[in-house]
Amino acid sequence: MFKILQYPDPRLKTAAQRVEKFDDALQKMIDEMFETHYAATNCAALAATQLDMENPKHITVIDFSPNKDQPLCLVNAEIIERSGEHTEEEGCMSVGGGTFEKVTRAAKIKVRARDRYGKPVEFEADGFMAKCIQHELDHLNGIIFLDRLSTLKRGRIDKRLGKLRRQGKV
């Protein structure tokens, strides 16, 4: 299992490396990512760059089903089409302190990726799945949802989180 990095850890700003080899080592990493995901409370998804690992790969694991029985692994994913806009509150496993803020993202997306075994996949997503994928792909590019907020809002959150860290609450 991996440790989930916490903001402001500078490794959260690291861009992931594309996956070139779909081997046993990759399968083990993906299994550990899902193990970490399922062990975390209220976790919808995780990107490799959120985890304490060397050379994080371009991988995200998603499962927000009630029984945690619908795992989705996206490797080298990219959004190839976007439409509409939707603004909704987001939180993040790497940003503690009960931090939720409104973020505007595409309402509908088309994704091209590979599954965990290297098989090409392409699909459309909307609603929570679209938001989740965009949030995780941001992570894989070194962007956290706080980066999408105004400077003023981000400053207030940084100040509040700093105080909580000093109190040992995050």
UniProtKB/Swiss-Prot annotation:
Kindly list the cofactors needed: Fe(2+)
Keywords for this protein: Hydrolase, Iron, Metal-binding, Protein biosynthesis
Q: Which Pfam families match?
A: Pep_deformylase (PF01327)
Query: What residues make up the catalytic site?
Result: E136
Q: Does the keyword Metal-binding apply?
A: yes
Its UniProt entry gives the catalysed reaction(s) as:
N-terminal N-formyl-L-methionyl-[peptide] + H2O = N-terminal L-methionyl-[peptide] + formate
Name used for this protein in its record: Peptide deformylase 1
Family according to the record: Belongs to the polypeptide deformylase family.
Q: Which SUPFAM superfamilies match?
A: Peptide deformylase (SSF56420)
Top enzyme class, one word, equals hydrolase
Q: What is its EC number?
A: 3.5.1.88
Q: Which GO terms describe its biological process?
A: co-translational protein modification; translation
Q: How is the cofactor bound?
A: Binds 1 Fe(2+) ion.
Please spell out the taxonomic lineage of the organism that makes this protein.
Bacteria, Pseudomonadati, Pseudomonadota, Gammaproteobacteria, Legionellales
Record keyword Iron present: yes
Q: Enumerate the residues binding Fe cation.
A: C92, H135, H139
For this protein, the record's InterPro entries field holds: Peptide_deformylase, Peptide_deformylase_sf
